Protein backbone atom coordinates (compact mmCIF):
# COMPACT_ATOMS: atom_id res chain seq x y z
CA UNK A 1 0.00 0.00 0.00
CA UNK A 2 2.95 2.31 0.62
CA UNK A 3 3.64 4.12 -2.65
CA UNK A 4 5.49 7.04 -1.05
CA UNK A 5 9.21 6.23 -0.84
CA UNK A 6 10.96 7.43 2.27
CA UNK A 7 13.83 9.80 1.50
CA UNK A 8 16.68 9.83 3.98
CA UNK A 9 19.33 12.36 4.87
CA UNK A 10 23.06 11.58 5.14
CA UNK A 11 22.63 10.20 8.68
CA UNK A 12 19.91 7.79 7.55
CA UNK A 13 17.05 9.64 9.25
CA UNK A 14 13.95 10.06 7.13
CA UNK A 15 13.24 13.53 5.78
CA UNK A 16 10.09 15.09 7.13
CA UNK A 17 7.41 15.63 4.52
CA UNK A 18 6.47 19.24 3.90
CA UNK A 19 3.00 20.32 5.03
CA UNK A 20 1.70 20.92 1.51
CA UNK A 21 2.56 17.36 0.47
CA UNK A 22 0.89 15.99 3.60
CA UNK A 23 -2.25 17.95 2.77
CA UNK A 24 -2.27 16.73 -0.83
CA UNK A 25 -1.82 13.09 0.23
CA UNK A 26 -4.64 13.37 2.78
CA UNK A 27 -7.06 14.44 0.04
CA UNK A 28 -6.31 11.37 -2.11
CA UNK A 29 -8.39 8.21 -1.64
CA UNK A 30 -10.40 9.60 1.26
CA UNK A 31 -12.68 6.57 1.01
CA UNK A 32 -9.77 4.55 2.42
CA UNK A 33 -10.21 6.26 5.78
CA UNK A 34 -7.24 5.73 8.05
CA UNK A 35 -5.29 3.81 5.39
CA UNK A 36 -3.18 6.48 3.71
CA UNK A 37 -0.38 6.25 1.14
CA UNK A 38 2.17 5.98 3.95
CA UNK A 39 0.55 2.88 5.48
CA UNK A 40 3.36 0.34 5.28
CA UNK A 41 1.42 -2.86 5.80
CA UNK A 42 -0.76 -5.11 3.70
CA UNK A 43 -4.28 -4.08 4.72
CA UNK A 44 -5.92 -7.37 3.74
CA UNK A 45 -3.30 -9.43 5.59
CA UNK A 46 -3.58 -7.16 8.64
CA UNK A 47 -7.36 -7.61 8.71
CA UNK A 48 -6.95 -11.39 8.34
CA UNK A 49 -4.50 -11.48 11.26
CA UNK A 50 -6.72 -9.25 13.39
CA UNK A 51 -9.71 -11.54 12.71
CA UNK A 52 -7.68 -14.32 14.38
CA UNK A 53 -6.84 -12.01 17.29
CA UNK A 54 -10.53 -11.12 17.58
CA UNK A 55 -11.48 -14.81 17.70
CA UNK A 56 -8.84 -15.42 20.37
CA UNK A 57 -10.23 -12.62 22.52
CA UNK A 58 -13.82 -13.85 22.07
CA UNK A 59 -12.79 -17.36 23.16
CA UNK A 60 -11.04 -15.86 26.19
CA UNK A 61 -14.16 -13.89 27.13
CA UNK A 62 -16.27 -17.05 26.86
CA UNK A 63 -13.84 -19.23 28.82
CA UNK A 64 -13.34 -16.73 31.65
CA UNK A 65 -17.09 -16.08 31.83
CA UNK A 66 -17.85 -19.81 32.01
CA UNK A 67 -15.26 -20.22 34.76
CA UNK A 68 -16.59 -17.20 36.68
CA UNK A 69 -20.03 -18.81 36.71
CA UNK A 70 -19.12 -22.46 37.36
CA UNK A 71 -16.04 -22.44 39.63
CA UNK A 72 -16.63 -24.21 42.93
CA UNK A 73 -14.54 -25.19 45.92
CA UNK A 74 -12.61 -23.63 48.76
CA UNK A 75 -11.89 -19.94 48.07
CA UNK A 76 -13.74 -20.21 44.77
CA UNK A 77 -15.51 -16.88 45.30
CA UNK A 78 -12.27 -14.89 45.10
CA UNK A 79 -11.15 -16.91 42.07
CA UNK A 80 -14.56 -16.42 40.43
CA UNK A 81 -14.16 -12.67 40.93
CA UNK A 82 -10.72 -12.84 39.29
CA UNK A 83 -12.15 -14.79 36.35
CA UNK A 84 -14.98 -12.24 35.98
CA UNK A 85 -12.50 -9.34 36.00
CA UNK A 86 -10.39 -11.05 33.35
CA UNK A 87 -13.49 -11.67 31.21
CA UNK A 88 -14.27 -7.95 31.38
CA UNK A 89 -10.71 -7.02 30.36
CA UNK A 90 -10.72 -9.57 27.52
CA UNK A 91 -13.98 -8.04 26.30
CA UNK A 92 -12.26 -4.63 26.19
CA UNK A 93 -9.49 -6.22 24.07
CA UNK A 94 -12.13 -7.77 21.82
CA UNK A 95 -13.73 -4.37 21.24
CA UNK A 96 -10.38 -2.66 20.55
CA UNK A 97 -9.46 -5.28 17.96
CA UNK A 98 -12.92 -5.14 16.34
CA UNK A 99 -12.67 -1.35 16.12
CA UNK A 100 -9.22 -1.60 14.52
CA UNK A 101 -10.54 -4.04 11.91
CA UNK A 102 -13.34 -1.57 11.16
CA UNK A 103 -10.86 1.34 10.91
CA UNK A 104 -8.89 -0.60 8.32
CA UNK A 105 -12.03 -1.13 6.23
CA UNK A 106 -12.83 -4.68 7.32
CA UNK A 107 -15.86 -6.17 9.01
CA UNK A 108 -15.13 -7.78 12.38
CA UNK A 109 -16.04 -11.48 12.30
CA UNK A 110 -18.18 -12.24 15.36
CA UNK A 111 -19.76 -15.29 13.73
CA UNK A 112 -19.58 -18.17 16.23
CA UNK A 113 -19.25 -20.69 13.39
CA UNK A 114 -15.57 -21.54 13.07
CA UNK A 115 -14.62 -19.47 16.11
CA UNK A 116 -12.50 -22.24 17.63
CA UNK A 117 -10.50 -22.71 14.43
CA UNK A 118 -9.84 -18.98 14.03
CA UNK A 119 -8.64 -18.58 17.62
CA UNK A 120 -5.05 -19.08 18.73
CA UNK A 121 -6.24 -20.33 22.13
CA UNK A 122 -8.65 -23.13 22.92
CA UNK A 123 -11.90 -23.15 24.82
CA UNK A 124 -11.49 -25.56 27.74
CA UNK A 125 -13.91 -25.70 30.63
CA UNK A 126 -11.82 -27.60 33.20
CA UNK A 127 -13.20 -30.21 35.59
CA UNK A 128 -12.34 -28.37 38.80
CA UNK A 129 -10.99 -25.05 40.05
CA UNK A 130 -7.32 -25.96 39.57
CA UNK A 131 -8.01 -27.23 36.04
CA UNK A 132 -9.78 -23.96 35.24
CA UNK A 133 -6.81 -21.96 36.51
CA UNK A 134 -4.42 -24.14 34.47
CA UNK A 135 -6.50 -23.76 31.30
CA UNK A 136 -6.55 -19.98 31.71
CA UNK A 137 -2.79 -19.90 32.35
CA UNK A 138 -2.18 -21.95 29.21
CA UNK A 139 -4.44 -19.66 27.17
CA UNK A 140 -2.67 -16.56 28.51
CA UNK A 141 0.75 -18.03 27.69
CA UNK A 142 -0.45 -18.72 24.14
CA UNK A 143 -1.75 -15.14 23.84
CA UNK A 144 1.49 -13.67 25.20
CA UNK A 145 3.63 -15.57 22.67
CA UNK A 146 1.22 -14.88 19.81
CA UNK A 147 0.98 -11.15 20.51
CA UNK A 148 4.76 -10.80 20.89
CA UNK A 149 5.14 -12.33 17.42
CA UNK A 150 2.48 -10.02 15.99
CA UNK A 151 4.09 -6.95 17.55
CA UNK A 152 7.35 -7.85 15.80
CA UNK A 153 5.43 -8.55 12.57
CA UNK A 154 3.71 -5.15 12.50
CA UNK A 155 6.80 -3.25 13.74
CA UNK A 156 6.93 0.06 11.88
CA UNK A 157 4.59 -0.97 9.02
CA UNK A 158 1.48 -0.47 11.17
CA UNK A 159 2.36 1.37 14.37
CA UNK A 160 -1.27 1.85 15.44
CA UNK A 161 -1.97 -1.90 15.36
CA UNK A 162 1.38 -2.59 17.03
CA UNK A 163 0.66 -0.12 19.86
CA UNK A 164 -2.82 -1.60 20.36
CA UNK A 165 -1.31 -5.09 20.61
CA UNK A 166 1.39 -3.85 23.00
CA UNK A 167 -1.33 -2.57 25.32
CA UNK A 168 -3.21 -5.86 25.10
CA UNK A 169 0.03 -7.80 25.68
CA UNK A 170 0.67 -5.90 28.91
CA UNK A 171 -2.72 -6.99 30.27
CA UNK A 172 -2.29 -10.57 29.02
CA UNK A 173 1.04 -10.78 30.88
CA UNK A 174 -0.73 -9.56 34.04
CA UNK A 175 -3.41 -12.22 33.52
CA UNK A 176 -0.75 -14.93 33.13
CA UNK A 177 0.90 -13.76 36.35
CA UNK A 178 -2.46 -13.76 38.14
CA UNK A 179 -3.24 -17.30 36.96
CA UNK A 180 0.25 -18.50 37.90
CA UNK A 181 -0.12 -16.98 41.37
CA UNK A 182 -3.54 -18.62 41.80
CA UNK A 183 -2.14 -21.95 40.68
CA UNK A 184 0.72 -21.72 43.19
CA UNK A 185 -1.74 -20.74 45.93
CA UNK A 186 -4.01 -23.70 45.17
CA UNK A 187 -1.29 -26.29 44.60
CA UNK A 188 1.00 -25.05 47.38
CA UNK A 189 4.16 -24.84 45.29
CA UNK A 190 5.36 -23.41 41.99
CA UNK A 191 4.27 -25.69 39.14
CA UNK A 192 7.01 -27.89 37.73
CA UNK A 193 7.95 -27.80 34.07
CA UNK A 194 6.47 -30.66 32.03
Language model regions located:
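Iron-associated oxidoreductase/ferritin-like identity signal
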Residues: 1-194
Amino acid sequence: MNDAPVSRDASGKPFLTDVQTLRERARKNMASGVVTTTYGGDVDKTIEILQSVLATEIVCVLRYTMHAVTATGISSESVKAEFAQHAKEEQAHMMAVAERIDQLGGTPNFNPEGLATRSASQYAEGENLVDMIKENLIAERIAVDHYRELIRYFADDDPATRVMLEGILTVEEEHATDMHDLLVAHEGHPPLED
